[in-house]
Amino acid sequence: MEEPDSTSPPSSPAAAASPSPTLPRRKRRKKQFPGMIPLSRVRILRNPPSSSSSERPQPQQALLYDPPPPRSAAIRRRGRPPSSALRLSRDLDVEALIAAAAGFPIDSLTEEEIHDAVIPSLGGTAQVSYIAVRNHIVSRWRSDPSLWLTESQALESIRAEHHGLVVVAYSFLLRHGYINFGLAPAILSAPPRQPPSLPAPAVIIIGAGLAGLSAARHLLSLGFKVAVLEGRCRPGGRVYTKRMHSSSAEFPNVTAAVDLGGSVLTGINGNPLAVLARQLGLPLHKVRDICPLYLPDGRPVDSDIDDRMEATYNQILEKVCQLRQTVCDELGAAVDASLGTALEVFGKAHEIATSGEERMLFDWHLANLEYANAALLSDLSMVFWDQDDPYEMGGDHCFIPGGNGRFVHALAENIPIFYGRTVTSVNYGCDGVLVYSNTGQAFRGDMALCTVPLGVLKKGSIQFKPELPVKKQEAIKRLGFGLLNKVALLFPYTFWDSSRDTFGHLTENSNQRGEFFLFYSYTSVAGGPLLIALVAGESAIEFEKTPPKDCVEKCLEVLRKIFTPKGVQVPNPLESVCTRWGTDRFTHGSYSYVTVGASGDDYDILSESVGDGRLFFAGEATNRRYPATMHGAMLSGFREAANIEKTARKRAQKPSESGNDIEMVDVGDNDLDDLFRVADTSFGGFSVIYDPASPNESSASLVRVQIGGREPDSKSGFLYGLVSRNNVMELAVMDGDEERLSALDRDFGRKLVNRTSLGIEGEALIVRIKEARSRNNRNKEAANEV
């Protein structure tokens, strides 16, 4: 994000604080009901065993010996002690649950395992044994992720006849980033693996957010060469921890760390970010689930009405989900409607008042739902809006004291990142990739990984050559990219109840229900008087049209209405920050959601590589299971690093394919000097190179015009332009350069520019010329050898 708008009204002190929010008692997404997810829409890979269920092999056979007996026999329970088989079964159950938390099915294979052919055929004894081995390895490493788990250690508890499965499972888990990842010293000091080819393949990664950083670190561990291009001057992307400071002379040392973007670890069971926190020794703060609500005039909401309306809201949401199931069963998923429309219909059926406390409470829950999805309810798909719910990670929702920037900067350490490089175009083809930046530099590699937010793809900020497949373009259009904004307020002291992490605020106007509807206290996280106010739904859009100073004043007005009647004075903040994620040119929004007409399949389409394995995609909007989450972004980086490694291994088997160094091409005049030494035609001070990919008379040609004298000792320079072949022929017959220059502007509407201003079309033409000449040179060399 660009530097957020901030204001610093004069005031008094505060103490240090930290991070930002997720939802407590009023859960971030909603209450869960058994019938909420249409099972027909959930993809479950169950590989049928070759034998009947009664003959199905048991996973115990995969282990070599029983676990050791309890350390002490001092305490004994009545009755027969557990048998070895029972103890083993319990251990296997625990291992299966740990593996499930990490994203594995308890009794089946993942799609990646099937694609990697980890076993010769699906089903039967081999699959059951492999699953037990896989779960055992995952569980063993997760028990202490500060250590590097070796293959020999993984073999220790496994029978000799299953050692082959251990080798396969260990290799799969290592390549896909399920084990031995992260920032522990033992992990960082491990030598890189042998690359799939020599020289090692080079990968250009676009974006230094969590997806880009996790992919870069994992690819480096796999022996690849990596360069990360980042448009901002910092890592993290939408995960941004800002240090707020007091500008008051009276309280000069008051600071606080605030997460202005991604802030909450949404479920720590199996969460790779929780693993990073454990490796770095970072404590986790559970978000406490008591959330009092206040009316616009500051009075607390009546608890009976609050409970009744929360129950009503959940009943309505349940009925909407039952309707969805009926629609899917009878008409199929092709028939869709907005979640907002369905909620409105059932809300009327429940005779919810159009005004008063009940209506405001219902609106608060709707605002909460819009926050969870960063979307207007009118845009959300009724059928697929919560398609990721079956995969939600369990456990507490937590903050990292000091902010998520702590592990962002740890991830970025020693990664080759080029900051201030905004990618403008990506050319991908059989010879590799060429990635252009706004600085006039191009980066050449074997493959590229694009991790930019969906909002950037929707905006068309990056031009792809050739164009992305129509299927991917349509998925980019279908999926939504919503908006959530925040106001961060650093106060001189804590005037609210710091024993609670959240409190809510109701509005009288339904159209403004998302405006400052929820406040988060950071006091318990870092000890500083810091509040965050959330702005969701329609209000998040209007928020960005309002000057930051006015936004802060409105937020303070809300706080004063809540606390002044209690005799509590609300001071002016020492510093304030208003986010503007929607107008941030590096994001154009906050996170993805499923619109009407879209589905979870679109996340899968976005994740697909293009260009015969030259261009890959990662980011939260490419993760069907964990979209709109920080861990979803990180896991997508691991996923694509594994896919890149797999592609490189296949390519290495072809004799003509080998890795290249990452080449940074300075796009100055020098590269064009070489090209224009062999121009297709010249006249006066004009030199022309035609597009080698198109003989069409209307196709663009690259024109260079010498400005100044042509004598060796005269001062001169060059300007460039794109002119059609037809116009080139007209220029050639004109009388002198002065007439030609006039015709360029007057008749052809063409401007001459310097080398760095040729734009995407010009850079693409230069690439085609270079590639054509390179092919010609190779063909000549081959002919000479013959």
Predicted regions and their residues:
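FAD-dinucleotide binding site
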Residues: 82-112, 149-152, 169, 176-699, ...
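Short helix-coil junctions and helix-kink-helix linkers
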Residues: 155-163
